[in-house]
Structure formats: structure tokens, C-alpha cells
Design a protein with these regions (language model features):
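Pre-active-site segment of Zn-dependent metallo-hydrolases
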Residues: 1-30, 40-45, 96-100, 128-139
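Cap/insert and terminal regions of metallo-dependent hydrolase folds
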Residues: 24, 39, 51-53, 57-60, ...
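Conserved phosphate-coordination/catalytic loops
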Residues: 6-9, 13, 34, 101-104, ...
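Conserved N-terminal glycine/acidic-rich loop preference
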Residues: 21-22, 30-36, 61-76, 122
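Conserved beta-strand hairpin/beta-sheet module of binuclear metal-dependent hydrolase folds
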Residues: 1-12, 103-123
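Metallo-beta-lactamase
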Residues: 54-117, 200-218
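Histidine-centered active-site/metal-ligand motif
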Residues: 29-34, 93-95, 121, 161, ...
Length: 218
């Protein structure tokens, strides 16, 4: 990140130089821990045909910073590339990168569908009925990436960030085959310890409590 925004505790799992060809970047919302323009510039410099899919209201920000091939999406909007459907889905969160732009752009998750498989990334979200709607519209999800961290204190962040228990509820709502916990262990954003989300998720998924154990963490 630049001088604004949180600092990483660990480096990216895959160094920039080792990334394969990138066709599309999907942006869930414009918070600094989800939209890093310098990283996007580096990826675009290595991938001339790169397309960038963003929520409504974020195109101006990216174009102003030199990002090309930007497409805006509202909830349920979709675009097909090479027989792959990209659908922008609702979430319960907010947006803003400064003092005066709060909720000036949209936020959400992304569903990627091929003829054989579906992959869902929830973005940042509190718990809502949106996930039942996603399941109703598109069927059970094969693979989901669900946020589990940045959940304390609940009185303050419950409307915008789910906790590990709610992640399990969303996995059930979506009828996922396999899910992976994300949005933990990379930045210090809220009050819980860095590894607390993973610890709670493991505890909630002991065989005695939850035999199916649908969410995995590295």
C-alpha cells in the first residue's frame, strides 16, 4: 500500500513476478485493503489485455490513476468472457477511501460461473439474506471464499463484518461444497488477535459440533 491504508503483516503468497497471465481483476469495494492501485498498475503493466471489473462509482478513481479497460457493475450485473460469467452480487458493507466519499460507490461479492463449476468470493460483508438469494438464483456453490476476520468488537462491526460462526451460516445458505476462510492474518484491522479468527473457526468445526467442517483455513 501507499502511506495511506493498513500495512501488511506478511507478503503476498505469490510474488508479483511469479503471477501467471492475468485476464481479469475483480474488485469487491474500494477500501485500501481490497483495492491497491499500485499493485493493479504493476499487474496491468505485465498484462496488456487485462480487464478490471469494479463496483459502480469506482471507474473514475481508477481511470484517473491510469488504469485501463475498467468496467462498472451494479448488484446482479454480469459480463461473459470466453464462456465464463462474472456476476456482481450484493453484500452488507460500505465504501470509502477518504473523509468525503463514504458510500459514494458500491460494494459486493463476485460469482464466477462456468458450465461445470461456480466460485464465489463474498468480499467484506455482515450477515444478510443476500446469500440465500444468491443460492436461489444460481444454485449451490462449488467453492466459496468467505471472510472470517476483523470481527471484534461485535457491537461495532457486526453489521459490516461476519464472524467465524456467521461464515459457517453463509456456507450453509450457499450450500457450498468447499469453502475457504479469508480476510484474516494479513492486516490488523480490528480488536481481535491476528490468529483469533482461525482459532475460533477450528473450534466451531470440531466433529462434535460441526461434522461437515465445510470451511478450511491454511
Amino acid at each position: 500500500f501507499s502511506w495511506i491504508g493498513p500495512k501488511r503483516l506478511i507478503p503476498p503468497a505469490v510474488p508479483m513476478a511469479e503471477l501467471p497471465k492475468v485476464d481479469v481483476i475483480l474488485v469487491s469495494h474500494n477500501h485500501y485493503d481490497h483495492l491497491d492501485i499500485q499493485s493493479m498498475k504493476k499487474i496491468q503493466a505485465r498484462n496488456s489485455s487485462l480487464k478490471v471489473f469494479v463496483p459502480k462509482g469506482d471507474m473514475r478513481l481508477l481511470k484517473k490513476r491510469g488504469i485501463r479497460n475498467v468496467f462498472e457493475f451494479g448488484w446482479w450485473d454480469s459480463k461473459q468472457l470466453d464462456s465464463v460469467d462474472f456476476i456482481f452480487t450484493p453484500a452488507q458493507h460500505w465504501s470509502g477511501r477518504g473523509v468525503f466519499d463514504r458510500n459514494k460507490s458500491w460494494w459486493g461479492g463476485w460469482l464466477i460461473k462456468t458450465k461445470l463449476k461456480s466460485i464465489f468470493h463474498a468480499g467484506d460483508t455482515g450477515y444478510s439474506q443476500d446469500f440465500l438469494k444468491i443460492r436461489s438464483k444460481f444454485g449451490p456453490i462449488d467453492v466459496a471464499f468467505l471472510p472470517i476476520g476483523a470481527f471484534e468488537p461485535r457491537w461495532f462491526v457486526s453489521g459490516q463484518h461476519i464472524d467465524p460462526a456467521e461464515a459457517l451460516k453463509i456456507a450453509a445458505d450457499l450450500e457450498v461444497t468447499k469453502a475457504y476462510g479469508m480476510h484474516w492474518g494479513t492486516f490488523i484491522l480490528t480488536d481481535e488477535a491476528v490468529l483469533e479468527a482461525r482459532k475460533q473457526l477450528i473450534k466451531l468445526q470440531t466433529p462434535a459440533i460441526n461434522p461437515t467442517r465445510p470451511i478450511f483455513t491454511p
